[in-house]
């Protein structure tokens, strides 16, 4: 539990640090100065935006790197969760930064183009644009992003008998994932954590089992984990959660639009008031600063730290709603995993309970977090809740229908 509690503290510390960095890069004049430099470098708006975003995000990540290092490397080694060397960790950190910069540049091009075209409705148009962008990322992630960090091989090469059982169980669920897209991931090269997941959508969907899971769980326990992951596809959780989240983000974008404009207006008013209060010598310096560094509207590249401050705050405040939706779907997937394993695993309840116990022990999970932490941070039900449900949900023993397996919608 000590590890989980440290992560809770680090989560809130990371939010505070990010906000502090954005505010510093805004109020110190760094963002405005960088905007002036990229304008002098190129007259092309696309080049200006690309350079500004790349340099700005590299500066942000550099300032965040001590916390990244402590959280992602020191803490996990201290508690015996990581097997990753420092060179590998730094390489992953750099690759993550590179991906972040590339994606951010593409988003910035869309964002600032829409702001320029429609200063009053850019929030709505950017929300529309975010839908195909997010869908495209979901589809290409298994092919482009995941292989940058881990190696994958078909599960049937190392676990043919388990693959046969998985295929039988997936067929029982009516889920068509070819054997060629059921993978084993070499997680043990970096971590001792036990996990499995599904990724992709449509023709890119695939099931991935970590090699640490295969090492720590037996065949029946692994099937319950796989059944849970299969439930996300059969129960259409990906499109459902996507739709719910997009509705929330529509509201967040509008709130963000109002907040960004208000902050910029207040900032300009504050600068003008400051100019009027100082003596002539200081006033001339402030005027020089204001002419070059004042942020007039959101179309200004130097508004990026303000945009990020607002985005961070509104997403943080929306976390309980977003995570509540996720917990609901994760509970459904737990239920589906038990139902689909019935008839394939001799005692699905015992296997499921054991799998949760082992994962909680290996991953150093907090089995029963405080109500506030659960409400604000947890995307899954707590371990205690999941074990309690796994031990008691057995409709087949009571002659009741299998709700989710028979009615996946």
Identify the residue ranges that each predicted region occupies.
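Multi-pass membrane glycosyltransferase architecture that uses lipid-linked
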Residues: 298-306
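Intrinsic disorder/low-complexity segments
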Residues: 265-296
